[in-house]
């Protein structure tokens, strides 16, 4: 019986195949000039629109015939958009221009409409476009206007609306919004838009969600705390969920993201899914009314595909659970028409890219495909049925590369036929496209059968009963010459030979897959730039027979592979009727969707979810949510609450008998969730590493993102985190890692191994490339020298590079390690110099080369390809590259003196001149502390005795050549590190420790400078300690009692500093108050803090602590560094108050405390030793991200009304709030505003330089060869004088002048103006160079210069005088006529000739000259008389003459005397009245013998203009005065 049945089945199958082979579809084709842009079906119709080159055409018979749309015309760059609701409507948008087109009858007729963009956008192209139905005839259109290449991603969004189905031109929506959506959750649809308010700097300072029912004639704002604080970046309607995506930090696009969800369209709650928007990707997937599905990107780089995590929510949309990790974000899709079935690709855990897995510069991804039939709760790999070499039990499965049937404008769909899927992929776990084959599934994707040996495109017709397949290419990678089709659901295939072979572009049928007609578009190879359009018609297969009920079979969706039973989702299971595969008929229900039957299921645990007061744990159990319970207690004001742990999923259809089997009520005491028991918003995470901590580093992967953290232990293991230390993965390197280097470019990391390979990452250790080393690291140490700006270039140095050895070699790569070229042999060190010095030669490289027992400095501008190596310096010790300078330490010929040379251009080196009394022995070292465009700070060792190491800090001039002493006896350690710190953000504030010898070793004291090292002072101690007790410093000078801080040489991590790179003015350090700095283990050691840039300090807490700054100083965190501890202290108000929190279950030994280098993160990590194992390290991640309820508001236009205030640093000796010659103001969070975080708020844009101050002594430092004496003045060093200065400077070649120094030079950072100029230099000529000096300063007196400077001005002057005399005096009667002019008679007697404007100007000049001459003469005579009177008074006091007599000056009455009759011997006239003293005393003495005053006083002396003629006459001849001795 079984045999007979098998034979019948085989016969029927063969018969079907023969019949299929005999059938051939009806096919038409046409060739179209140019390559088409798009081809699409209108929904539920046979109408097809085709966008070709410079034309748009329609077919109304499934692609058989075509008609060009004349209304649209010859448009060359257009976009087609279908209305998502109205299936009859579609749009044609033109990228260029403002005329667009619309159809309301599926393309039969078209009409134009115009959209007028803003004037500022008229020159842009149309990018993305979206269409929303609002209500009735209302249409909302979103258009993006984008800049042209290469700025095509810079787009501005505009929304337009029409209330009459675009019968008239749409209008601009009266709201400036980038995001709008139609909210259909309400009874009446409304438009929701995001409205941003920006300041003058372009920053979003406010973001609000506004709603309108009348196209924003009126609107209302929807309130939610998350909206007010952050920035809303997206609003969308997903099934029954209205979702608002908010960026927590308005000023950082990569900041954490929160999701707020509404089910009623009005009220929102914040979901518990918060994540870092580090890679700009959150993708919402097709969702059900019961659950919201989305993926969140975890990493991306230009060399790898984006990957992330798949999440689903509960029925409220507020609580999310993780479904799948490492998901390929481009290949995750829900299977259409079936609830709960998902297909996804995941990346393998191994982040190592092997050399053979790299092609075309990109890695072949290791991925695998998975399927879930229970909404993502469980996942299975895909089984292949007809491949014995790939069995699921052996770990082999199908890896689909693509499984979509139609790409419907950015939406992947699996096909319209339930349970029938098709796609291409490979066996194994790689994504090698060239090895792909095509597979088909008839059970919804659980099992697959190979049907073709290559990849191609496919489409389904008649609910899967017709399948067309077109390979991407034919033989030898040429065009496809045939298409394949199946009429029995893929069991057998027919072939049709194409009349015109082509490379297929699109294969389409009706959108619901119910038609038996298809349209294929492809590129024709032999026709230049042409497209072929094929129309296939299978309707006559099976003689047009329509299926009967007997031809159909019932098929269940989601059949479990374990027991063969259908799986229930949301309380129901689904089935549908499908044609039997061997039936010879068509369903022929065109435009009719597949009917799905629903059957109710009994309720199970899967139909329940956690109640609102519980949350899902990592183990999948509902546990109490303290935050929600606290809110419930507060709202109901009860002592106890009974709350259920679970509830049935909303809209679940399961058959429910009782909740008791699944729901448990728990009683809670509200006192446990209120008051001090309120749960903390600070989260603590814990990780453990094998081995002891040996190296760690943060790696920046974006401009404002440094959350990637790499940890290495002494076992050679590497652990990596991309979320700030919250979680780690061990990177599975096969080799032991010796160490790693982090490059200056974003994401660049190199791992050095003991073997013949190394690993390189370009995305912050998310993935690594494995490469061969140029020389094995086993030969010696390896050094990597990165290019400062080119991320693909670095230099590899390896080998035994000791002096006398020749095994060290330098190699260069330009492709980040894929290949190397040899640079130079015997190189100990190499560096790229050009980017540092910013010179035109972009390839300048320096190398320290070993040559026998000497080291030389080699340079090259073409990677040492010269015939001979150029050595710029022969005998060097080392070189240091700092910004704008390269400093080289050299030895003299006798090796008795260490010298330094400096270059600013990379080619010319200048000698470094130390102060004349500063001698350096050959074995003495110097350390380049730092450099800037203004100067170099250098520490020169003066005592290298073990245990007594110290030296002097020298500071250079602007070109790095001349140095002055800044501070003596500065402490250093045995390896050359110096107790020196420059405080971040503050200009020129330095801290250093000096040392003096003692029996115990060193006595160290801390000094601070507020003027860039010109002046140093001890730090004034606080008045009281942290317990309120007074320090015993009263009455003592600072030299005997001051604050001392442990410096750079005593830090366990040299990256720790007193100050922060972002918290301006905040300083923290460990130390003590007293005469000297005590050992760190001393009981007096405590933590001290300054909030004003080091002016004043206070003690925080006794003990020794690690410290760090978070969020630009809004969080200060300290943890005990000496004793085991399980808690840390933190401050949220800049150190005003401190709180304590536990981070560990038991005390641990803290090794270090760290956060991102910029101190802008709210995440910290605490490294600690493990008590359980002496060979492991613990890490505790402390996260304050949810600690602050809001972001601080900043209003740079009105700073007094926001959360910030201005703070001004100042010099302690200044009363003008000045530092470096100017008053500067920095923005800091205001006191009392400690409920907000700063984030990436651009505080630097609020920086103000209020004014430049007048220059004072604080703006100057001692000049070269001068030192600061105890009295604060600058004096010449011993043995130097001005002659030394002349001889020293003039002996240099090419020098013709020297300067007489004042001993002072202006500090380069100072911008002061005016005031006292301490540095006013006077140039002097070097002996024998007077001529060059005079020429340089314009002092040579050649004949030509004399002529130009003297004779030409005189010639011009006399010419002008003669012209005025000729036109203004001689022509008007000469000087005799002018002598008649009276100052008090106006111009009645003077009527000059005025024939033109020149005469007017000349005559006015003459008048003015007369008045000026008269007044000047009178003043001159008065001054002479006063001077004579003063002389007489002095002589009278000395020789007995008596004061009291008044002297008067006679002023001539008539101006004619000024010019004609005045006595020329005016000295005699003055002497006539010189015998009387002019009394100028304020309080004259009393005398007993007085003389009578003269009867006739000439009062015109004091009021010339008011005198009458009578007065003048009476005063003309006064009587002689008598004098009594």
Swiss-Prot record:
Keyword annotations of the record: Glycoprotein, Golgi apparatus, Membrane, Protein transport, Receptor, Repeat, Signal, Transmembrane, Transmembrane helix, Transport
Gene3D superfamilies, per the entry: 2.10.70.80, 3.30.60.270, YVTN repeat-like/Quinoprotein amine dehydrogenase (2.130.10.10)
Residues on Cytoplasmic side: 1367-1399
Positions bearing carbohydrate: 959, 1252
GO CC term, one of those recorded: membrane
Listed InterPro entries: Sialidase_sf (IPR036278), Sortilin_C (IPR031777), Sortilin_N (IPR031778), VPS10 (IPR006581), VPS10-sortilin (IPR050310), WD40/YVTN_repeat-like_dom_sf (IPR015943)
Biased composition (Basic and acidic residues): 1514-1525
Single biological process term from Gene Ontology: Golgi to vacuole transport
TM region(s), chain numbering: 1346-1366, 1400-1420
Protein topology in the membrane: Multi-pass membrane protein
Region (Disordered): 1503-1525
Keyword Repeat: yes
Residues in compartment: Lumenal: 22-1345, 1421-1525
Signal peptide: 1-21
SUPFAM superfamilies: Oligoxyloglucan reducing end-specific cellobiohydrolase (SSF110296), Sialidases (SSF50939)
Repeat region (BNR), residues: 58-67, 101-111, 371-380, 439-449, 484-493, 1088-1098, 1130-1139
Cellular location(s): Golgi apparatus, trans-Golgi network membrane; Prevacuolar compartment membrane
Function recorded in the entry: Functions as a sorting receptor in the Golgi compartment required for the intracellular sorting and delivery of soluble vacuolar proteins, like carboxypeptidase Y (CPY) and proteinase A. Executes multiple rounds of sorting by cycling between the late Golgi and a prevacuolar endosome-like compartment.
PANTHER family listed in its UniProt record: SORTILIN RELATED, SORTILIN-RELATED RECEPTOR
Family to which the UniProt record says this protein belongs: Belongs to the VPS10-related sortilin family.
Protein name: Vacuolar protein sorting/targeting protein 10
Organism: Clavispora lusitaniae (strain ATCC 42720)
Native organism taxonomy: Eukaryota, Fungi, Dikarya, Ascomycota, Saccharomycotina
């Amino acid at each position: 019986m079984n045999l007979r049945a098998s034979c019948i089945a085989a016969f029927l199958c063969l018969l079907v195949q023969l019949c299929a082979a005999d059938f051939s579809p009806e096919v038409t084709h046409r060739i179209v000039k140019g390559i088409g842009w798009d081809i699409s079906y209108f929904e539920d119709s046979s109408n097809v629109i085709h966008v070709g080159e410079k034309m748009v055409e329609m077919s109304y018979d499934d692609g058989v015939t075509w008609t060009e749309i004349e209304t649209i015309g010859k448009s060359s760059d257009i976009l087609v958009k279908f209305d998502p609701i109205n299936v009859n409507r579609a749009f044609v948008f033109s990228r260029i221009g403002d005329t667009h087109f619309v159809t309301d009858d599926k393309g039969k007729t078209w009409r134009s409409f115009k959209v007028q963009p803003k004037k500022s956008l008229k020159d842009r192209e149309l990018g993305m476009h979206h269409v929303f139905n609002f209500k009735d005839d209302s249409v909302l259109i979103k258009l993006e206007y984008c800049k042209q290449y290469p700025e095509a991603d810079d787009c501005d969004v505009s929304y337009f609306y029409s209330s009459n189905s675009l019968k008239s031109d749409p209008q601009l929506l009266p709201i400036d919004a980038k995001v709008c959506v139609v909210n259909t959750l309400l009874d009446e649809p409304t438009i929701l838009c995001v409205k941003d308010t920006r300041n003058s700097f372009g920053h979003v300072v406010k973001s609000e969600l506004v709603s309108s029912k009348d196209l924003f004639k009126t609107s209302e704002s929807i309130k939610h705390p998350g909206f007010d604080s952050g920035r809303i970046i997206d609003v969308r309607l997903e099934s029954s969920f209205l979702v608002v995506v908010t960026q927590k930090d308005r000023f950082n696009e990569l900041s954490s993201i929160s999701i707020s969800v509404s089910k009623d369209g009005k009220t929102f709650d914040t979901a518990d899914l918060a994540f870092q928007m580090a890679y700009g990707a959150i993708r919402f997937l097709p969702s059900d009314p019961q659950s919201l599905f989305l993926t969140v990107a975890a990493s991306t780089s230009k060399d790898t595909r984006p990957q992330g995590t798949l999440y689903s929510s509960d029925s409220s949309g507020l609580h999310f659970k993780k479904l799948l990790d490492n998901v390929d974000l481009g290949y995750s899709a829900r299977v259409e028409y079936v609830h709960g079935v998902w297909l996804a690709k995941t990346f393998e855990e191994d982040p190592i890219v092997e050399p053979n897995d790299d092609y075309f510069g990109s890695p072949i991804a290791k991925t695998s495909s998975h399927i879930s039939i229970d909404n993502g709760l469980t996942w299975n790999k895909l089984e292949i049925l007809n491949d014995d070499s790939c069995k699921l039990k052996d770990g082999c499965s199908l890896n689909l590369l693509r499984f979509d049937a139609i790409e419907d404008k950015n939406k992947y769909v699996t096909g319209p036929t339930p349970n029938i899927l098709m796609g291409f992929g490979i066996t194994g776990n790689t994504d090698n496209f060239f090895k792909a084959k095509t597979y088909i599934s008839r059970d919804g994707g659980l099992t697959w059968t190979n049907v073709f040996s290559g990849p191609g495109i496919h489409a389904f017709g008649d609910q899967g009963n017709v399948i067309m397949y077109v390979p991407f290419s034919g033989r030898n990678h040429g065009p496809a010459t045939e298409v394949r089709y199946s009429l029995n659901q893929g069991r057998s295939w027919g072939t049709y030979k194409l009349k015109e072979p082509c490379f297929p572009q699109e294969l389409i049928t009706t959108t619901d897959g119910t038609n038996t007609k298809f349209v294929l578009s492809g590129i024709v190879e032999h026709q230049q730039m042409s497209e072929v359009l094929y129309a296939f018609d299978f309707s006559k297969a099976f003689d047009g027979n329509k299926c009967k009920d007997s031809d159909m079979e019932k098929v269940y969706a989601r059949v479990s592979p374990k027991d063969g039973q259908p799986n229930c989702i949301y309380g129901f299971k689904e089935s549908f009727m499908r044609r039997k595969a061997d039936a010879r008929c068509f369903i022929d229900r065109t435009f009719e969707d597949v009917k799905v039957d629903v059957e109710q299921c009994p309720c199970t645990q899967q139909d329940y979810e956690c109640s609102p007061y519980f949350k899902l744990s990592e183990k999948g159990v509902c546990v109490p949510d303290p935050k929600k319970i606290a809110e419930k207690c507060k709202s109901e004001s009860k002592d106890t609450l009974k709350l259920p742990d679970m509830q049935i999923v909303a809209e679940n259809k399961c058959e429910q008998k009782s909740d008791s089997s699944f729901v448990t009520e728990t009683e809670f005491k509200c006192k446990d969730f209120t008051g001090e028991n309120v749960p903390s918003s600070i989260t603590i995470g814990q990780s453990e590493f094998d081995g002891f901590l040996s190296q760690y580093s943060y790696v920046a992967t974006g401009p404002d993102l440094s959350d990637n953290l790499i940890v290495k232990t002494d076992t050679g293991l590497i652990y990596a985190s991309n979320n700030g230390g919250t979680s780690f993965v061990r990177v599975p390197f096969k080799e032991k890692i010796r160490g790693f280097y982090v490059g200056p470019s974003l994401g660049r990391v190199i791992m050095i191994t003991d073997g013949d390979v190394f690993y390189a990452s370009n995305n912050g250790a998310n993935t690594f490339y494995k490469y061969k080393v140029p020389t094995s690291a086993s030969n010696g140490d390896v050094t990597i020298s990165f290019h400062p700006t080119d991320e693909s270039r670095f230099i590899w140095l390896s080998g035994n590079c000791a002096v006398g050895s020749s095994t060290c070699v330098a190699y260069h790569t330009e492709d980040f390690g894929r290949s190397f070229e040899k640079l130079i042999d015997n190189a100990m060190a190499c560096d790229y110099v050009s980017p540092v010095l910013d010179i035109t030669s972009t390839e300048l490289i320096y190398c320290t080369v070993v040559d026998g027992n000497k080291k030389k400095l080699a340079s090259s501008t073409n990677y040492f390809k010269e015939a001979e190596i150029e050595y710029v310096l022969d005998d060097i010790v080392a070189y240091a590259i700092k910004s704008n300078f390269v400093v080289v330490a050299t030895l003299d010929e006798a090796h008795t003196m260490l010298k330094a040379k400096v270059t600013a251009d990379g080619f010319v080196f200048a000698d470094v001149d130390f102060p004349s009394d500063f001698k350096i022995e050959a074995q003495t070292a110097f350390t380049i502390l730092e450099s800037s465009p203004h100067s170099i700070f250098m520490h020169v060792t003066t005592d290298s005795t073990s245990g007594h190491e110290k030296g002097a800090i020298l500071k250079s001039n602007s070109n790095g050549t001349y140095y002055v002493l800044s501070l003596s006896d500065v402490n250093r350690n045995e390896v050359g590190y110096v107790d020196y710190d420059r405080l971040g953000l503050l200009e020129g504030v330095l801290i250093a420790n000096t040392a003096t010898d003692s029996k115990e070793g060193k006595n160290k004291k801390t000094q601070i400078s507020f003027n860039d090292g010109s002046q140093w002072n001890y730090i004034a101690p606080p008045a009281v300690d942290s317990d309120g007790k007074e320090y015993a410093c009263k009455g003592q000078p600072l030299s005997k009692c001051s604050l001392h801080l442990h410096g750079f040489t005593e830090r366990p991590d040299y990256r720790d500093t007193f100050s922060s790179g972002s918290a301006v003015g905040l300083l923290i350090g460990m130390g003590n108050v007293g005469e000297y700095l005590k050992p760190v283990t001393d009981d007096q050691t405590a933590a001290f803090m300054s909030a004003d840039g080091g002016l004043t300090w206070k003690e925080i807490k006794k003990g020794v602590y690690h410290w760090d700054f978070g969020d630009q100083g809004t969080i200060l965190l300290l943890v005990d560094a000496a004793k085991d501890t399980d808690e840390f202290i933190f401050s949220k108000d800049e150190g005003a108050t401190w709180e304590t929190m536990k981070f560990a279950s038991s005390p641990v030994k803290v090794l270090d405390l760290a956060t991102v280098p910029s101190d802008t993160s709210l995440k910290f990590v605490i490294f600690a030793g493990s008590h359980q194992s002496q060979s492991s390290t613990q890490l505790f991640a402390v996260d304050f991200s949810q600690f602050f309820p809001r972001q601080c508001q900043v209003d740079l236009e009105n700073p007094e009304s926001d959360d910030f205030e201005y703070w001004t640093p100042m010099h302690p000796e200044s009363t003008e709030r000045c530092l470096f010659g100017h008053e500067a103001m920095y923005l800091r969070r205001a006191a009392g505003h400690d409920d907000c975080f700063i984030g990436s708020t651009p505080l630097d844009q609020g920086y103000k330089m209020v004014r430049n101050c007048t220059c004072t002594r604080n703006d100057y430092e001692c000049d070269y060869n001068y030192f600061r004496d105890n009295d604060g003045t600058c004096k010449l060093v011993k043995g130097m004088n001005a002659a030394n200065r002349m001889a020293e400077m003039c002996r240099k070649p090419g020098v013709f002048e020297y300067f007489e120094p004042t001993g002072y030079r202006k500090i380069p950072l100072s911008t002061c103006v005016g005031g006292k100029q301490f540095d006013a230099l006077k140039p002097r000529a070097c002996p024998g160079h007077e001529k060059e000096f005079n020429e340089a300063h314009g002092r040579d007196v050649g004949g030509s210069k004399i002529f130009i400077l003297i004779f030409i001005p005189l010639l011009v002057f006399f010419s002008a005088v003669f012209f005025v005399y000729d036109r203004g005096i001689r022509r008007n009667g000469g000087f005799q006529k002018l002598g008649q002019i009276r100052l008090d008679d106006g111009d009645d007697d003077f009527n000059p000739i005025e024939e033109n404007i020149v005469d007017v100007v000349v005559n006015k000049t003459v008048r003015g000259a007369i008045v000026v001459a008269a007044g000047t003469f009178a003043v001159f005579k008065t001054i002479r008389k006063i001077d004579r009177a003063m002389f007489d008074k002095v002589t009278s006091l000395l020789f007995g003459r008596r004061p009291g007599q008044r002297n008067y000056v006679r002023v001539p009455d008539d101006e004619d005397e000024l010019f004609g009759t005045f006595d020329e011997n005016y000295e005699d006239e003055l002497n006539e009245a010189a015998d009387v003293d002019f009394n100028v005393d304020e309080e004259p003495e009393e005398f007993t013998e007085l003389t009578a005053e003269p009867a006739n006083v000439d009062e015109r002396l004091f009021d010339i203009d008011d005198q009458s003629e009578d007065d003048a006459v009476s005063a003309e001849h006064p009587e002689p005065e008598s004098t009594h001795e």
